[in-house]
C-alpha cells in the first residue's frame, strides 16, 4: 500500500522473529526489510503463533487498519481475521478485541484484504479456510469429499472493521475450473467499471500454485472466472509455486510470493507491473 508519506509498504506473514514483517520502498522495485515488530501486542482471542497474510489500508482520517489471520485460542490451529489500528504505516498496530470473522465451524477465516469502492464504501474480502477441516491430501483437501473454500465479501463501516450486515460469497473452488483443493488470497480492485478479483488456486506447496482472476460489473458479483493463469510456475526465469498476490488500488502494480529457490525452504516477495483493460489482466 502507498502511505501518506508517499512510500510503498509491504506486510508479510510471521518470520525473521516478527509476527508481522514490514518492508518499505520508494519506487515499488527496490525494497528494504525493516527491523520492527508491527504488531507488538495481541488481542485476547489469539495465540502467540502463526500470524498470516497481513494487509493494510489507509483510512480517510489518516489512520492505518491492518487485517491479519491470527490463530484462535478457543479452536487452534484454526484462524480468525483480526484487525488492528495504527497512526503510522509501520505501527505499532493496536489490535481490536473482537475479530472481524472466525467461522471456526467451517475451518476459520484467513487471507483478508481491504477495498475502498468508488462511492466511499469499505469492504473486506477473505477466505473461509475450509481445507483446514478437509480429509487429507494436498493442503488437507485433496481427498474426497472435497470441502468448500469460499471467498466472502464483508461490507464494513468507515472505521474499516465494524461489519455492516452479513458477508456474501463471491467465489469458491471448482474442480471443473482446475482450482485444485482451494481458492485463497483474494485481492480486489476496480478499473473502469470492472471489479477484478485476484486469487490463487492449488496449494502453496504445489508447483501448480498460481495467480488467477475473476471479473464482475457489481462488487457483489456474479464474478466470472477468466481461468487464466496470470502468474504460474516457470514464468519469468523460473518462478516456483507463485501466488498470494496483492494488487495495489491503482491497479497497475502487484506483489506476490513464491519459493526463493529449489530448496523450498523460504518464500520470497516478487513485484510485477500489471495492465488492466476491459475484463483482461496481463503482466507487462
Predicted features along the sequence, with ranges:
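Carbohydrate-active catalytic/glycan-binding domains of CAZyme proteins
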Residues: 1-284
Amino acid at each position: 500500500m502507498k502511505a501518506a508519506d508517499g512510500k510503498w509498504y509491504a506486510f508479510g506473514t510471521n518470520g525473521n522473529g516478527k509476527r508481522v514483517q514490514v518492508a518499505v520502498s520508494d519506487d515499488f522495485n527496490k525494497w528494504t526489510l525493516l527491523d520492527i515488530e508491527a504488531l507488538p501486542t495481541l488481542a485476547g482471542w489469539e495465540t502467540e503463533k502463526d500470524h498470516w497474510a497481513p494487509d493494510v489500508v489507509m483510512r480517510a482520517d489518516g489512520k492505518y487498519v491492518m487485517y491479519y489471520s491470527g490463530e484462535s485460542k478457543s479452536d487452534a490451529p484454526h484462524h480468525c481475521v483480526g484487525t488492528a489500528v495504527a497512526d503510522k504505516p509501520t505501527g505499532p498496530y493496536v489490535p481490536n478485541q473482537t475479530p472481524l470473522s472466525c467461522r471456526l465451524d467451517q475451518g476459520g477465516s484467513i487471507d483478508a484484504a481491504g477495498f475502498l469502492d468508488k462511492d466511499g464504501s469499505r469492504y473486506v474480502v477473505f477466505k473461509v479456510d475450509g481445507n483446514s477441516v478437509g480429509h487429507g491430501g494436498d493442503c488437507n483437501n485433496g481427498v474426497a469429499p472435497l470441502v468448500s473454500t469460499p471467498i466472502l465479501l464483508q461490507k464494513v463501516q468507515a472505521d474499516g472493521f465494524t461489519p455492516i450486515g452479513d458477508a456474501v460469497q463471491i467465489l469458491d473452488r471448482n474442480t471443473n475450473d482446475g482450482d485444485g483443493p482451494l481458492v485463497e488470497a483474494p485481492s480486489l480492485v476496480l478499473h473502469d467499471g470492472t471489479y477484478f478479483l485476484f486469487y490463487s488456486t492449488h496449494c502453496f506447496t504445489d508447483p501448480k500454485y498460481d495467480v488467477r482472476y475473476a471479473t464482475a460489473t457489481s462488487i457483489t458479483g456474479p464474478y466470472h472466472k477468466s481461468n487464466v493463469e496470470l502468474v504460474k510456475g516457470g514464468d519469468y526465469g523460473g518462478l516456483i509455486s507463485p501466488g498470494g498476490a496483492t494488487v495495489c488500488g491503482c491497479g497497475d502494480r502487484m506483489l506476490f510470493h513464491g519459493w526463493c529457490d529449489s530448496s523450498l525452504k523460504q518464500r520470497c516477495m516478487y513485484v510485477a507491473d500489471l495492465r488492466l483493460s476491459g475484463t483482461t489482466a496481463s503482466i507487462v
